[in-house]
Amino acid sequence: MDIVYQEITELAEIFNVQDRGEKLVADLRAREAAAREKIGSTDGKLSAVVWFSSTQVDADPYVAGKFGAPANILSALGIKNVIDSEEEWPTVGWETIAKSNPSMIVAAKLDRRRYPADDIAVKHQFLENDAVTKLMPAVKGKHVFDMDAQSMSTSLRVIEGIETLASDIAASDLNK
């Protein structure tokens, strides 16, 4: 979120509305803190993979690397991203993901239908039926959380991604 806060501050200076920029940043920081408070301390015990899409349902998925908005969402909540790639959206095989045993899978909800796995229902069906993914504790434990894909790009909507994920975790048994 720091990059978003910086951009807001810089734009507020350019347009000579620093007070409004400061107020917006303070509001976003408060929302971020409230989301963290909702799940309490994760003590480094939670991990995740963020699945954006796949060119084919059973192809290696595009997942969030260690840079970009999804990585920032996870970091804001103290969640480890199991994907350690410097690419923003690398493709990683499900066998590799399963070996890393993420506590949760965050699945992007997309309005587009460029690829079959853009459909969130198709993602869920795949996870529940694939020979590898259906055995993952995150899938078996129903810790597959949907997130609007717009929250996964660096913008003001990142805060919605943080809040959505915090609410999903709080409603689950993950951080108890």
Mark where each language-model region is.
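Short acidic/glycine-rich loop or secondary-structure boundary segments that cap or lie
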Residues: 56-61, 114-116
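Extracytoplasmic substrate-binding proteins
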Residues: 1-58, 83, 139-176
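Alpha-helical scaffolding within the catalytic cores
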Residues: 34, 90-96, 126-133
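Proline-aspartate-enriched helix->loop->beta-strand connector
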Residues: 94-110
